[in-house]
Amino acid sequence: MRKRYDTIVIGGGIIGTSIAYHLAKAGKKTAVFESGEVGKKATSAAAGMLGAHAECDKPGTFFEFARASQKAYKRLTGELKDISGIDIRRHDGGILKLAFSESDREHLMQMGALDSVEWLEADEVYKLEPNAGKGILGANFIRDDVHVEPAAVCRAFARGARMLGADVFEYTPVLSIESEAGAVRVTSASGTAEAEHAVIASGVWSGALFKQIGLDKRFYPVKGECLSVWNDGISLTRTLYHDHCYIVPRHSGRLVVGATMKPGDWNEQPELGGIEELIRKAKSMLPGIESMKIDQCWAGLRPETGDGNPYIGRHPENDRILFAAGHFRNGILLAPATGEMMADMILGNPVKTEWIEAFKAERKEAVHR
Protein backbone atom coordinates (compact mmCIF):
# COMPACT_ATOMS: atom_id res chain seq x y z
CA MET A 1 0.00 0.00 0.00
CA ARG A 2 1.27 3.47 -0.85
CA LYS A 3 1.95 5.86 2.01
CA ARG A 4 -0.53 8.71 2.16
CA TYR A 5 0.11 12.16 3.60
CA ASP A 6 -1.62 15.49 3.77
CA THR A 7 1.51 17.18 2.40
CA ILE A 8 4.84 16.02 1.00
CA VAL A 9 7.67 18.56 1.11
CA ILE A 10 10.46 17.94 -1.41
CA GLY A 11 13.70 19.28 0.01
CA GLY A 12 15.18 19.12 3.49
CA GLY A 13 17.01 22.41 3.73
CA ILE A 14 15.93 25.21 6.03
CA ILE A 15 13.01 26.18 3.75
CA GLY A 16 11.62 22.66 3.43
CA THR A 17 12.00 21.84 7.12
CA SER A 18 10.37 25.13 8.12
CA ILE A 19 7.37 24.31 5.92
CA ALA A 20 7.16 20.81 7.40
CA TYR A 21 7.40 22.16 10.94
CA HIS A 22 4.63 24.70 10.47
CA LEU A 23 2.35 22.13 8.81
CA ALA A 24 3.01 19.50 11.48
CA LYS A 25 2.33 22.08 14.19
CA ALA A 26 -1.06 22.66 12.55
CA GLY A 27 -1.80 18.93 12.79
CA LYS A 28 -1.14 17.99 9.18
CA LYS A 29 0.37 14.60 8.39
CA THR A 30 3.56 15.69 6.66
CA ALA A 31 6.61 14.09 5.07
CA VAL A 32 9.94 15.55 3.96
CA PHE A 33 11.86 13.86 1.15
CA GLU A 34 15.52 14.93 1.11
CA SER A 35 17.99 13.67 -1.48
CA GLY A 36 20.93 13.75 0.95
CA GLU A 37 21.22 14.74 4.59
CA VAL A 38 18.90 17.35 6.06
CA GLY A 39 20.46 20.81 5.98
CA LYS A 40 23.73 19.77 4.35
CA LYS A 41 23.59 21.87 1.16
CA ALA A 42 23.08 25.66 1.00
CA THR A 43 21.81 25.79 4.60
CA SER A 44 25.03 24.45 6.07
CA ALA A 45 27.08 26.91 4.01
CA ALA A 46 25.26 30.03 5.25
CA ALA A 47 26.52 32.38 7.96
CA GLY A 48 23.06 32.88 9.46
CA MET A 49 22.68 36.64 9.29
CA LEU A 50 19.08 37.76 9.68
CA GLY A 51 19.91 40.80 7.61
CA ALA A 52 16.60 42.25 6.48
CA HIS A 53 18.27 45.65 6.29
CA ALA A 54 21.52 44.32 4.86
CA GLU A 55 19.57 43.10 1.83
CA CYS A 56 17.14 46.03 1.49
CA ASP A 57 17.85 49.74 1.38
CA LYS A 58 14.24 50.91 1.10
CA PRO A 59 10.78 49.85 2.27
CA GLY A 60 8.81 47.56 -0.02
CA THR A 61 7.13 44.18 -0.26
CA PHE A 62 10.34 42.17 0.02
CA PHE A 63 11.47 44.18 3.04
CA GLU A 64 8.11 43.74 4.78
CA PHE A 65 8.25 39.98 4.21
CA ALA A 66 11.85 39.85 5.43
CA ARG A 67 11.03 41.86 8.56
CA ALA A 68 8.08 39.61 9.37
CA SER A 69 10.38 36.60 9.11
CA GLN A 70 13.11 38.26 11.14
CA LYS A 71 10.64 39.01 13.95
CA ALA A 72 9.34 35.42 13.88
CA TYR A 73 12.75 34.21 15.03
CA LYS A 74 12.17 35.84 18.42
CA ARG A 75 9.20 33.54 18.98
CA LEU A 76 10.83 30.52 17.40
CA THR A 77 13.94 30.67 19.58
CA GLY A 78 12.05 29.51 22.66
CA GLU A 79 9.41 27.51 20.79
CA LEU A 80 11.91 25.35 18.92
CA LYS A 81 13.98 24.81 22.07
CA ASP A 82 10.87 23.61 23.93
CA ILE A 83 9.73 21.25 21.17
CA SER A 84 13.02 20.00 19.74
CA GLY A 85 15.46 20.58 22.57
CA ILE A 86 17.79 22.42 20.16
CA ASP A 87 19.14 25.91 20.81
CA ILE A 88 19.24 27.83 17.51
CA ARG A 89 21.83 30.18 19.06
CA ARG A 90 20.22 33.47 18.25
CA HIS A 91 22.87 36.10 18.89
CA ASP A 92 21.88 39.69 19.65
CA GLY A 93 24.15 42.63 18.96
CA GLY A 94 23.04 43.66 15.51
CA ILE A 95 25.00 44.70 12.43
CA LEU A 96 27.27 47.65 11.75
CA LYS A 97 27.22 48.51 8.04
CA LEU A 98 30.47 50.42 7.74
CA ALA A 99 31.31 53.46 5.61
CA PHE A 100 34.94 53.86 4.54
CA SER A 101 34.29 56.52 1.88
CA GLU A 102 31.93 59.37 1.11
CA SER A 103 30.14 57.22 -1.47
CA ASP A 104 29.65 54.56 1.22
CA ARG A 105 28.22 57.21 3.53
CA GLU A 106 25.85 58.55 0.88
CA HIS A 107 24.62 55.05 0.08
CA LEU A 108 24.02 54.20 3.73
CA MET A 109 22.22 57.49 4.33
CA GLN A 110 19.56 56.30 1.86
CA MET A 111 18.48 53.81 4.52
CA GLY A 112 17.40 56.71 6.74
CA ALA A 113 13.79 56.09 5.72
CA LEU A 114 13.86 52.89 7.79
CA ASP A 115 13.12 53.73 11.42
CA SER A 116 15.01 50.66 12.61
CA VAL A 117 18.32 52.04 11.29
CA GLU A 118 20.53 54.40 13.31
CA TRP A 119 23.44 56.32 11.81
CA LEU A 120 26.56 56.44 13.99
CA GLU A 121 29.52 58.75 13.53
CA ALA A 122 33.00 57.27 13.58
CA ASP A 123 33.68 57.92 17.28
CA GLU A 124 30.44 56.14 18.19
CA VAL A 125 31.39 53.15 16.03
CA TYR A 126 34.76 52.81 17.76
CA LYS A 127 33.10 53.03 21.18
CA LEU A 128 31.00 49.99 20.25
CA GLU A 129 33.77 48.10 18.44
CA PRO A 130 37.19 49.50 19.35
CA ASN A 131 39.00 46.87 17.27
CA ALA A 132 37.31 47.87 14.01
CA GLY A 133 39.56 48.97 11.15
CA LYS A 134 41.02 52.44 10.72
CA GLY A 135 39.46 55.01 8.42
CA ILE A 136 35.80 54.35 9.22
CA LEU A 137 33.66 57.44 8.57
CA GLY A 138 30.57 56.06 10.29
CA ALA A 139 28.11 53.21 10.13
CA ASN A 140 24.47 52.27 10.06
CA PHE A 141 23.71 50.41 13.27
CA ILE A 142 20.87 47.93 12.84
CA ARG A 143 20.04 46.30 16.17
CA ASP A 144 17.40 43.97 14.75
CA ASP A 145 19.73 42.34 12.20
CA VAL A 146 20.94 39.62 14.55
CA HIS A 147 22.10 36.14 13.57
CA VAL A 148 21.47 32.45 14.22
CA GLU A 149 23.33 29.22 13.49
CA PRO A 150 21.70 27.89 10.30
CA ALA A 151 22.49 24.21 10.86
CA ALA A 152 20.99 24.40 14.34
CA VAL A 153 17.83 26.08 13.02
CA CYS A 154 17.39 23.44 10.32
CA ARG A 155 17.94 20.59 12.80
CA ALA A 156 15.44 22.20 15.16
CA PHE A 157 12.80 22.52 12.42
CA ALA A 158 13.37 18.92 11.32
CA ARG A 159 13.35 17.44 14.82
CA GLY A 160 10.44 19.65 15.82
CA ALA A 161 8.47 18.42 12.81
CA ARG A 162 9.27 14.82 13.77
CA MET A 163 8.20 15.42 17.37
CA LEU A 164 4.90 16.74 16.00
CA GLY A 165 4.35 13.63 13.89
CA ALA A 166 6.08 14.31 10.57
CA ASP A 167 8.21 11.79 8.69
CA VAL A 168 11.62 12.94 7.46
CA PHE A 169 13.26 10.72 4.83
CA GLU A 170 16.93 11.33 4.08
CA TYR A 171 18.79 9.98 1.03
CA THR A 172 15.44 9.84 -0.75
CA PRO A 173 15.68 11.82 -4.01
CA VAL A 174 12.38 12.56 -5.71
CA LEU A 175 12.22 11.40 -9.32
CA SER A 176 8.81 12.65 -10.40
CA ILE A 177 5.60 14.42 -9.39
CA GLU A 178 2.31 13.55 -11.04
CA SER A 179 -1.25 14.64 -10.43
CA GLU A 180 -4.04 12.11 -10.32
CA ALA A 181 -7.64 12.20 -9.15
CA GLY A 182 -7.73 13.86 -5.75
CA ALA A 183 -4.01 13.53 -5.02
CA VAL A 184 -0.43 14.19 -6.01
CA ARG A 185 1.77 11.15 -6.57
CA VAL A 186 5.43 11.56 -5.63
CA THR A 187 7.86 8.91 -6.81
CA SER A 188 11.23 8.69 -5.08
CA ALA A 189 14.15 6.30 -5.14
CA SER A 190 12.41 4.44 -2.30
CA GLY A 191 8.98 4.10 -3.88
CA THR A 192 5.78 6.06 -4.31
CA ALA A 193 3.75 8.15 -1.87
CA GLU A 194 0.58 10.20 -2.26
CA ALA A 195 -0.55 13.45 -0.72
CA GLU A 196 -3.22 16.09 -1.01
CA HIS A 197 -0.46 18.63 -1.63
CA ALA A 198 3.20 18.60 -2.62
CA VAL A 199 5.64 21.46 -2.09
CA ILE A 200 8.84 21.83 -4.12
CA ALA A 201 11.52 23.32 -1.86
CA SER A 202 14.78 21.98 -3.28
CA GLY A 203 16.73 25.19 -3.67
CA VAL A 204 18.83 25.49 -6.81
CA TRP A 205 17.96 21.88 -7.69
CA SER A 206 14.24 22.72 -8.01
CA GLY A 207 14.51 23.43 -11.73
CA ALA A 208 14.07 19.82 -12.89
CA LEU A 209 10.85 19.43 -10.91
CA PHE A 210 9.60 22.81 -12.10
CA LYS A 211 10.11 21.60 -15.65
CA GLN A 212 8.17 18.40 -14.90
CA ILE A 213 5.16 20.37 -13.66
CA GLY A 214 5.22 22.72 -16.64
CA LEU A 215 6.70 25.84 -15.06
CA ASP A 216 9.19 27.54 -17.34
CA LYS A 217 11.31 29.02 -14.57
CA ARG A 218 15.02 28.50 -14.11
CA PHE A 219 17.24 28.57 -11.06
CA TYR A 220 20.80 29.83 -11.37
CA PRO A 221 23.58 28.75 -9.01
CA VAL A 222 25.54 31.52 -7.34
CA LYS A 223 28.46 30.02 -5.50
CA GLY A 224 29.25 31.56 -2.13
CA GLU A 225 32.53 30.88 -0.34
CA CYS A 226 33.14 31.39 3.38
CA LEU A 227 35.81 30.79 5.96
CA SER A 228 35.93 30.70 9.74
CA VAL A 229 38.75 31.57 12.12
CA TRP A 230 39.29 31.09 15.83
CA ASN A 231 39.13 34.39 17.68
CA ASP A 232 42.22 34.65 19.88
CA GLY A 233 40.74 37.20 22.25
CA ILE A 234 39.99 40.26 20.12
CA SER A 235 36.65 41.69 21.19
CA LEU A 236 33.88 41.70 18.57
CA THR A 237 30.24 41.80 19.68
CA ARG A 238 28.44 42.85 16.52
CA THR A 239 28.50 41.70 12.92
CA LEU A 240 30.62 43.94 10.70
CA TYR A 241 29.52 44.44 7.08
CA HIS A 242 31.12 46.24 4.15
CA ASP A 243 31.46 45.71 0.40
CA HIS A 244 29.29 42.57 0.42
CA CYS A 245 31.50 40.98 3.07
CA TYR A 246 30.62 40.27 6.69
CA ILE A 247 32.31 39.08 9.87
CA VAL A 248 29.92 37.25 12.18
CA PRO A 249 30.92 36.42 15.79
CA ARG A 250 29.80 32.97 16.97
CA HIS A 251 29.08 31.71 20.49
CA SER A 252 31.77 29.07 19.92
CA GLY A 253 34.52 31.69 19.72
CA ARG A 254 34.79 31.48 15.95
CA LEU A 255 34.36 34.33 13.49
CA VAL A 256 32.65 33.53 10.19
CA VAL A 257 33.69 35.55 7.14
CA GLY A 258 31.66 35.52 3.94
CA ALA A 259 30.69 35.45 1.24
CA THR A 260 31.78 35.60 -2.36
CA MET A 261 29.31 35.60 -5.24
CA LYS A 262 30.19 33.52 -8.31
CA PRO A 263 27.23 33.22 -10.71
CA GLY A 264 26.90 30.10 -12.82
CA ASP A 265 29.39 28.02 -10.81
CA TRP A 266 28.05 24.57 -9.82
CA ASN A 267 31.29 23.56 -8.07
CA GLU A 268 30.77 23.36 -4.31
CA GLN A 269 34.47 23.51 -3.41
CA PRO A 270 36.02 26.81 -2.21
CA GLU A 271 38.79 28.30 -4.34
CA LEU A 272 41.93 30.09 -3.23
CA GLY A 273 41.06 33.30 -5.08
CA GLY A 274 37.69 33.60 -3.38
CA ILE A 275 39.10 32.96 0.09
CA GLU A 276 41.90 35.47 -0.59
CA GLU A 277 39.29 38.11 -1.50
CA LEU A 278 37.40 37.48 1.75
CA ILE A 279 40.56 37.75 3.84
CA ARG A 280 41.45 41.07 2.19
CA LYS A 281 38.02 42.55 2.89
CA ALA A 282 37.89 41.15 6.43
CA LYS A 283 41.27 42.69 7.32
CA SER A 284 40.00 46.16 6.40
CA MET A 285 37.08 45.76 8.81
CA LEU A 286 38.94 43.96 11.61
CA PRO A 287 42.73 44.16 11.22
CA GLY A 288 43.36 41.78 14.11
CA ILE A 289 41.81 38.94 12.14
CA GLU A 290 45.10 38.56 10.24
CA SER A 291 46.75 36.69 13.12
CA MET A 292 43.82 34.37 13.83
CA LYS A 293 44.02 30.65 13.08
CA ILE A 294 41.93 29.38 10.17
CA ASP A 295 39.26 26.90 11.23
CA GLN A 296 37.82 25.86 7.87
CA CYS A 297 36.76 27.05 4.41
CA TRP A 298 33.63 25.97 2.55
CA ALA A 299 31.21 26.88 -0.23
CA GLY A 300 27.54 26.52 -1.06
CA LEU A 301 25.20 27.22 -3.97
CA ARG A 302 22.62 29.96 -3.59
CA PRO A 303 19.51 29.54 -5.77
CA GLU A 304 18.97 32.72 -7.79
CA THR A 305 15.91 33.39 -9.94
CA GLY A 306 15.55 35.65 -12.94
CA ASP A 307 14.73 38.69 -10.81
CA GLY A 308 16.53 37.67 -7.63
CA ASN A 309 13.40 37.01 -5.60
CA PRO A 310 11.97 33.65 -4.52
CA TYR A 311 9.07 31.74 -6.00
CA ILE A 312 6.59 31.10 -3.19
CA GLY A 313 3.06 30.06 -4.06
CA ARG A 314 0.78 27.69 -5.94
CA HIS A 315 1.08 26.22 -9.39
CA PRO A 316 -1.10 28.51 -11.55
CA GLU A 317 -2.95 25.51 -13.04
CA ASN A 318 -2.84 22.96 -10.19
CA ASP A 319 -3.79 23.97 -6.65
CA ARG A 320 -2.32 20.77 -5.21
CA ILE A 321 1.26 21.63 -6.20
CA LEU A 322 3.06 24.46 -4.45
CA PHE A 323 6.63 25.72 -4.41
CA ALA A 324 9.05 27.66 -2.21
CA ALA A 325 12.44 27.99 -3.87
CA GLY A 326 14.93 30.54 -5.15
CA HIS A 327 15.63 32.40 -1.91
CA PHE A 328 19.12 33.38 -3.13
CA ARG A 329 21.09 35.01 -0.26
CA ASN A 330 18.13 35.04 2.09
CA GLY A 331 17.11 31.46 2.81
CA ILE A 332 17.94 31.61 6.51
CA LEU A 333 16.29 35.00 6.96
CA LEU A 334 13.11 34.08 5.07
CA ALA A 335 12.63 30.52 6.35
CA PRO A 336 10.08 31.28 9.11
CA ALA A 337 7.87 33.53 6.96
CA THR A 338 8.08 31.12 4.03
CA GLY A 339 7.07 28.20 6.25
CA GLU A 340 4.15 30.14 7.69
CA MET A 341 3.02 31.38 4.26
CA MET A 342 3.10 27.89 2.75
CA ALA A 343 1.24 26.42 5.72
CA ASP A 344 -1.40 29.16 5.56
CA MET A 345 -1.93 28.63 1.83
CA ILE A 346 -2.38 24.88 2.31
CA LEU A 347 -4.62 25.31 5.36
CA GLY A 348 -6.76 27.93 3.64
CA ASN A 349 -5.80 30.71 6.05
CA PRO A 350 -5.55 34.33 4.91
CA VAL A 351 -2.27 35.37 3.26
CA LYS A 352 -1.37 38.94 2.36
CA THR A 353 -2.34 39.59 -1.24
CA GLU A 354 0.81 41.61 -1.89
CA TRP A 355 2.96 38.65 -0.83
CA ILE A 356 1.07 36.28 -3.11
CA GLU A 357 1.42 38.66 -6.04
CA ALA A 358 5.08 39.45 -5.34
CA PHE A 359 6.31 35.87 -5.17
CA LYS A 360 4.05 33.97 -7.58
CA ALA A 361 5.81 32.14 -10.41
CA GLU A 362 3.87 33.93 -13.13
CA ARG A 363 4.91 37.43 -12.01
CA LYS A 364 6.27 39.68 -14.75
CA GLU A 365 8.40 42.14 -12.83
CA ALA A 366 10.84 42.04 -9.96
CA VAL A 367 9.65 42.91 -6.48
CA HIS A 368 10.67 46.43 -5.45
CA ARG A 369 13.45 45.95 -2.92
From Swiss-Prot:
- Temperature-related activity annotation: Optimum temperature is 40 degrees Celsius. Retains 60% of the maximum activity at 0 degrees Celsius, suggesting it is a cold-adapted enzyme.
Q: Which catalytic reaction applies to this protein?
A: glycine + O2 + H2O = glyoxylate + H2O2 + NH4(+); glyphosate + O2 + H2O = aminomethylphosphonate + glyoxylate + H2O2 + H(+); N-ethylglycine + O2 + H2O = ethylamine + glyoxylate + H2O2; sarcosine + O2 + H2O = methylamine + glyoxylate + H2O2
Any binding details for the cofactor?
A: Binds 1 FAD per subunit.
What does altering I332V do? Shows 7.1- and 8-fold increase of affinity and catalytic efficiency to glyphosate, respectively, while the substrate affinity to glycine decreases 235-fold and catalytic efficiency decreases 113-fold
InterPro entries recorded = FAD-dep_OxRdtase, FAD/NAD-bd_sf, Gly_oxidase_ThiO
Keyword Flavoprotein in the entry? The reply is yes
Keywords for the protein's UniProt record, in alphabetical order = FAD, Flavoprotein, Oxidoreductase, Thiamine biosynthesis
The cofactors it requires, by name, are:
FAD
Please name the top-level EC class of this enzyme: oxidoreductase
Its protein name is Glycine oxidase
